[in-house]
């Protein structure tokens, strides 16, 4: 019984053979499935090729026969082109196979097996993607140290050198074109030099404006609102009054031109008030000089050529003759 038990265990422990996994065969190109080969290494000239649709025709040099070509039949494409294509009038080398509707080209290459040139309408590959990420890599290398790889540096040295330099990198100024187009005011690089100018302007114009200390305490990019600087250049439109017609002539115009624009309205109003009544005041002054003398009887003494006063009113004569 003891001998039979190990045999049973051995039979049980023997692993069963794993079933064989059949890997799918590599599918040949579409134009080469069950197709009969008619000719090899035939040269021809591309008659036309549509890049968008991906097919065209090649004219054989030996038999002058047109052979259909699909973009999947191109074996060696131009490495600079994004899509497979052949250019119009290009000389190519290919194999001829029998298709469903006639002869088709396969394994299309350039003469001698070189890559084809491709169509000029085919898009080129984008080769300069890495340039956008290079500045970040350069800054990381500068922060880590000059001429020292990050592997050679210890963890303590990395923490000491990278920690103080990573903080200012987070507050980088925006690009030049963005700063020039969308933002106005002092640039972040010249904040120290222009701090005094901002404080002087704020004290003279707006006492409630933030000072240089308030700007320094906040972010480096904090600036006063742009409207404050635009108000002094934009003023409401006011129609200018017509120039007054004064007897003085060019003197009044010269004075008006010499004064600033903001003070043109006030002198004009005062000048207008003074200039309107002269004709009326001349008549009114002459009339009161006659009527009060006749009505009230007040003497009006006027100097003569000899310097002695002359009594012009009749009331004055009566007063002098009354005592006699």
From Swiss-Prot:
Record flagged with keyword Lipoprotein: no
Gene Ontology MF: a single term: nucleic acid binding
Residues of the CSD domain: 44-108
InterPro entries: Cold_shock_domain (IPR050181), CSD (IPR011129), CSD_CS (IPR019844), CSP_DNA-bd (IPR002059), NA-bd_OB-fold (IPR012340)
Biased composition (Basic residues): 123-133, 168-186, 225-238, 263-275
Gene Ontology BP, a term: regulation of gene expression
Origin superkingdom: Eukaryota
Keywords: Cytoplasm, Phosphoprotein, Ribonucleoprotein, RNA-binding, Transcription, Transcription regulation, Translation regulation
Name of the protein this chain belongs to: Y-box-binding protein 2-B
Gene: ybx2-b
């Amino acid at each position: 019984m003891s001998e039979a038990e190990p045999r049973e265990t051995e039979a049980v422990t023997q692993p069963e053979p794993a079933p064989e996994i059949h890997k799918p065969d590599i599918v040949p190109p579409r134009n080469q499935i069950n197709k009969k080969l008619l000719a090899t290494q035939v040269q021809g000239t591309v008659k036309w090729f549509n890049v968008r649709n991906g097919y065209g025709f090649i004219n054989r040099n030996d038999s002058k026969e047109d052979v259909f070509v699909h973009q999947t039949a191109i074996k060696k494409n131009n490495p600079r082109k994004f899509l497979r294509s052949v250019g119009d009038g290009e000389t190519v080398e290919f194999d001829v196979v029998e298709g469903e509707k006639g002869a088709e080209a396969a394994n299309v290459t350039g003469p001698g097996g070189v890559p084809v040139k491709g169509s000029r309408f085919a898009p080129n590959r984008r080769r300069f993607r890495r340039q956008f990420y290079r500045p970040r890599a350069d800054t990381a290398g500068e922060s880590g140290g000059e001429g020292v790889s990050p592997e050679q540096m210890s963890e303590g040295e990395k923490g000491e050198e990278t920690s103080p330099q990573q903080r200012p990198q987070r507050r980088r100024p925006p690009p030049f074109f963005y700063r020039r187009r969308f933002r106005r005011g002092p640039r972040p690089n010249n904040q120290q030099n222009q701090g005094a100018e901002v404080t002087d302007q704020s004290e003279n114009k707006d006492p409630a404006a933030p000072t240089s200390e308030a700007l320094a305490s906040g972010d480096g990019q904090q600036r006063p609102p742009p409207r404050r600087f635009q108000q002094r250049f934009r003023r409401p439109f006011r129609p200018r009054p017509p120039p007054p017609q004064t007897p003085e002539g060019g003197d009044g115009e010269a004075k008006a031109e010499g004064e600033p624009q903001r003070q043109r309205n006030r002198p004009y109003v005062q000048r207008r008030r003074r200039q309107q009544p002269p004709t009326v005041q001349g008549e009114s002054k002459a009339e009161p000089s006659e009527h009060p003398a006749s009505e009230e009887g007040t003497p009006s003494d006027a100097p003569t050529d000899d310097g002695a006063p002359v009594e012009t009113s009749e009331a004055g004569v009566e007063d002098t003759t009354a005592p006699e």
